[in-house]
């Protein structure tokens, strides 16, 4: 993370490579199998900052926005062969990383969330389970924000 004007190209590349290029490589390897079986579900893990941006996180935001564009493009390319692609965009999720935030910062975040709580990792997992299942057989090219209503 860092301000764009202070970010080196190496810092930019590191985040883009981990978050976006690795997803492309994984999908590129798996898609032929899904095409042969005429079905499958690709789920890209994005973020609400991929939808809305965030000052000080231009590389992360761009990589997560790229995950959305990748899912939408793949949904169009592979959909005719029965392969679905979607993106999940988590908001504030209770993790060891967010547990390190100060109480004041946490309170500020909770004020922005209508449900007045952070999400749990199983909230994300349940959305992914839905997208991977036949219950979502007509859902493709979508971004599902799992954020307690923070970004309506």
Predicted segments with their positions:
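Substrate-binding pocket helix/loop in short-chain dehydrogenase/reductase
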Residues: 2-4, 8-16, 98, 109
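Active-site loop immediately N-terminal to the catalytic Tyr-X3-Lys motif
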Residues: 3-5, 52-58, 80-81, 116, ...
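Active-site loop-to-helix junction immediately N-terminal to the catalytic Tyr of the SDR YXXXK motif
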Residues: 7, 53-61, 73, 101
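Active-site helix of classical SDR
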Residues: 27, 63, 71
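Alpha-helical segment proximal to the catalytic Tyr-Lys
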Residues: 32, 76-80, 137
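Residue(s) in the substrate-gating loop at a strand-loop-helix junction
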Residues: 47
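C-terminal helical subdomain
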Residues: 87, 110-135, 139, 148
């Amino acid at each position: 993370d860092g301000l764009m004007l202070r970010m080196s190209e190496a810092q930019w590349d590191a985040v883009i490579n981990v978050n976006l290029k690795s997803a492309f490589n994984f999908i590129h390897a798996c898609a032929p199998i899904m095409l042969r079986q005429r079905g499958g579900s690709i789920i890209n893990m994005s973020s609400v900052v991929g939808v809305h941006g965030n000052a000080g996180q231009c590389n992360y935001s761009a990589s997560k926005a790229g995950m959305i564009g990748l899912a939408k493009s793949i949904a169009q390319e592979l959909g005719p062969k029965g392969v679905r692609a979607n993106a999940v965009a988590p908001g504030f999720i209770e993790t060891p990383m967010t547990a390190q935030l100060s109480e004041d910062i946490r309170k500020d975040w909770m004020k922005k969330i209508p449900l007045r709580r952070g999400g749990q990792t199983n909230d994300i997992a349940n959305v992914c389970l839905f997208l991977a299942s036949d219950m979502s057989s007509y859902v493709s090219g979508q971004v599902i924000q799992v954020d307690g209503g923070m970004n309506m």
